[in-house]
């Protein structure tokens, strides 16, 4: 199992660096381009959600990122310093916010949201 874990500032360059490092590990484990794309999309959506909505782009606020990569699955977990997500307000695809979470929910095998922590689990089939 590979574990990629990092606490980063709410900064686009830090986010890009973490995402690139995580994707390199993911690509080494899985050669299925569709699966890798799905994981990239999940990673991007969850971290950008923390950047934009959770931490409101405030640089000093932290984003905790954890990616667990195993032969059978990948888990992406993100925690920010925001107030949390009201998942019930994310059901409308035409709403101003919530499309990213709805997308992640649709392509994940399991999505768990608890206040300001969100985790997506995807099994490799």
What residue spans do the PLM features occupy?
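Residues in soluble alpha-helical coiled-coils and helical-bundle/repeat scaffolds
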Residues: 13, 30-31, 112
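Short, structured helix-loop boundary elements
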Residues: 15-16, 36, 40, 60, ...
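Conserved beta-strand-loop-beta-strand hairpin that lines the nucleotide-binding pocket
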Residues: 1-4, 51-125
């Amino acid at each position: 199992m590979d574990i990629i874990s990092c606490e980063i500032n709410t900064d686009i360059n830090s986010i890009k660096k973490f995402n690139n490092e995580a994707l390199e590990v993911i690509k080494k484990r899985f050669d299925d381009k569709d699966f890798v794309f799905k994981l990239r999309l999940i990673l991007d959506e969850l971290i950008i959600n923390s950047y934009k909505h959770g931490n409101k782009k405030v640089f000093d606020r932290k984003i905790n990122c954890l990616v667990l990569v195993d032969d059978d699955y990948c888990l992406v977990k993100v925690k920010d310093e925001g107030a949390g997500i009201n998942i019930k307000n994310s059901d409308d695809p035409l709403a101003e916010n919530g499309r990213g979470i709805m997308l992640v929910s649709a392509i994940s095998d399991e999505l768990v949201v608890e206040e300001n922590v969100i985790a997506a689990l995807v099994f490799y089939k």
